A protein has these predicted regions:
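Short glycine- and acidic-rich boundary segments immediately preceding or forming the N-terminal edge
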Residues: 1-13
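Conserved beta-strand hairpin/beta-sheet module of binuclear metal-dependent hydrolase folds
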Residues: 10-65
């Protein structure tokens, strides 16, 4: 997945930003909730050699997911929503995880 047309810098401290990757096969939503804090909803990874799209985006805009992502939310256990989840959780060291029973 190529990240075109996206911001190259993080949102301002007081801004809320919602970025949706997909839709189609593999969706991911990245939410800046303000004050440099982030939530990631689902993981989206295309292929085996690329990182999850949220991590690519964070790298692009200079966000450190290890300390800035506070929550990873998994909506359901379909492959297109959880592929790359292990890699995402490894990089989001302080994030809590919320997993739907669906």
């Amino acid at each position: 997945m190529v990240l075109t047309g996206l911001m190259k810098t993080p949102p301002l401290h007081e801004e809320v930003e919602i970025t949706i990757f997909g839709p189609g096969y593999g969706e991911c939503i990245v939410v800046h909730v303000g004050s440099g804090r982030w939530i990631v909803i689902d993981s989206c990874k295309h292929g085996t050699k690329t990182p999850p799209v949220a991590l690519k985006y964070f790298d692009r805009i200079g966000v450190n997911p290890a300390v800035q992502v506070e929550l990873v939310l998994v909506t359901h256990w379909h492959d297109d929503h959880i592929r790359g989840l292990n890699e995402l959780l490894e990089r989001c060291e302080v994030a809590g995880i919320c997993i739907s029973e669906a």
